[in-house]
Amino acid sequence: MNYQLEKTMHNVLKLNNGGGKLKMNIKFALAGNPNCGKTTMFNALTGANQYVGNWPGVTVEKKEGKVKGNKEDNITVVDLPGIYSLSPYTLEEVVSRDFLLNEDPDVIIDLVDATNIERNLYLTTQLIETGVPVVVALNMADLIEKRG
């Protein structure tokens, strides 16, 4: 699954201008509820080895990395702590909210846990309302397949 995601992301980032390549400076923000796979995606895209845990609160500060295998462009991925809404209750949620609202990411990738879509959609609607382009990425599809 990570290979397919990485390949898709690289294909999305390819731009062609009359046969010539455009240089890009792009900053992606990985947002979503706690424990939905943001850090796993960050590691797959950047080649990093950030700690991943199967419980909320593992990522407590934002982490930045460059997309691996792309030497021509400056493509930064920002792994944000998990949030349920843009109304923060914890310091980690403040970090995420402040980045999303004040640091002008070019695109927000909203990772949604496919096993519990309803819980994730409140944040999705708030992210769309920011006016920043949002890509909704359903994650954990393998768990849905196992359920039948």
Where are these regions (language model features)?
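Conserved donor sugar-nucleotide recognition element shared by glycan-biosynthetic enzymes
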Residues: 92
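Conserved C-terminal guanine-recognition region of P-loop GTPase G domains, centered on the G4
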Residues: 68-72, 95-148
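Conserved G1/Walker A P-loop phosphate-binding module
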Residues: 2-89, 103
